[in-house]
Amino acid sequence: MSLVQSAMFNHHMGPSHTRSRSFELFQEAKTLRVAACKRSYSDDLNISTKRARTAPPSPPYETATPTRASRLVISNLVKPTSNLRSRSLSPNKKFSSPLSPSSSPIATVTSPISSPQNIKIKLPSISDALNLPPITSKEPVKLKPIVPTVSLDYFDTYKPNDENWRYGLLDKIAKESKHFHLNQYNYLNDHAKPSFDSKLSSKIQQSSIANGKKINFPYESNYTYLNKTYLNDVKNYPEYLELAAESLLQLKERQLPPPPLQSHQKQHPPPPPHLPVQGLLPVPAPPVSHFSSSYTTPQAPTFYHPPSQQQQQTPPPQTLHHQQPQPPISTHKFIPISPPSAKKSRSDLLKSPPKHHHHHAPRVCISCGSDQSPCWRPSWSIKQGQLCNSCGLRYKKTKARCLNDKCKKIPAKGEWTLMQSKGKETFEDGIEGYSCIACGWRVEVLPKS
């Protein structure tokens, strides 16, 4: 504030005002202090004029006895050098004058000493630098291809050298060699084919298939063949039309049995038909007659028949014209066997429970009605029957069964859990219980043993 006040006083003081000696000395000390603390851009460039920090300080001007007048002249005319300013370059110790160059009394005095290093460099503004046109080259830059130098040492890995060496070698052989001829090696030429001295087979030279009968595969597709070429094949090969008929006749002949021989018939006469005895025997096959004999001779059966119920039937003779295709004649004795029973549905098996016989009664599951099981398991009652393997395992885990005679379902573990989650219901007879998931009837649950 003292510097600002002094500057303000200098402007407002008149010429008749007289200053005291102490005021002049005080003003001179402030001027030297401001000049020593002030930094400029030229001070940073003036590196060569700086003195080493280890050197002893010396006065910049050698004066014996500086007087007050000489101090004023030096301070007014000569700008102090950088040796008098602070050695510290810390930004905290910078001092900038708040006064403008026009109002400051120190800035009005220019130093007569000048050097080329004090010239300030003027840089362009940011806007001017951004508005400059981009630097573009008029001609495109042509870069040379990167070729490895190692491959140049080996002619077989470098194509230009390989071709030059190969053609040079061929020219040298053709010129210098007298007993070597390149015509013997026609494989070097792409258009030439090797010639063989060995004889070819006559079957290969003279093909039995005419060229007109072949289908030109690369130039003829299925579409063009169906439109044009197949008519020529039909004309050239009429046997193709007869092939289908011949194949049908052959198949028909294979299905028909061969005609029986007369000697074979005499040696093995056909068995006679028999009537069933007391409903236990099945109905026999119809009688077989032959044109060679007018009647059949009965053959003794392997089982006993009452003489009153055993009858013989003599069929009328048939001529050859009315003979129908006959099955092959069996050479073994006629033994009637009970035909296999047809597989019944589950409802039929449940309606008709199996009859207990004293010999080999077939087993049927009383729950699902199946007669096929690897093993049989006990049910809830020995009198009613047994369970198959799957039903027996389910009943062993759940101990639950449907009481409906038409259902008799044994729920699986997941089905039984679903029945229990629905809860018990009250039925018409007033008994509470779980309902069957299949038919809705009451399910009987036995305690697990």
From Swiss-Prot:
SMART domains named among the record's database cross-references: ZnF_GATA
Region entry Disordered, spans: 48-67, 83-111, 256-361
Composition bias, Polar residues: 290-300
InterPro entries: Znf_GATA (IPR000679), Znf_NHR/GATA (IPR013088)
Name of one Pfam family that matches: GATA
GO biological process: cellular response to starvation; chromatin organization; filamentous growth; filamentous growth of a population of unicellular organisms; filamentous growth of a population of unicellular organisms in response to biotic stimulus; filamentous growth of a population of unicellular organisms in response to neutral pH; filamentous growth of a population of unicellular organisms in response to starvation; negative regulation of transcription by RNA polymerase II
Compositionally biased intervals (Low complexity): 88-105, 305-324
Induction statement: Expression is controlled by the transcription factor ACE2.
Protein name: Transcriptional regulatory protein ASH1
Species assigned in the record: Candida albicans (strain SC5314 / ATCC MYA-2876) (Yeast)
Taxonomic placement: Eukaryota, Fungi, Dikarya, Ascomycota, Saccharomycotina
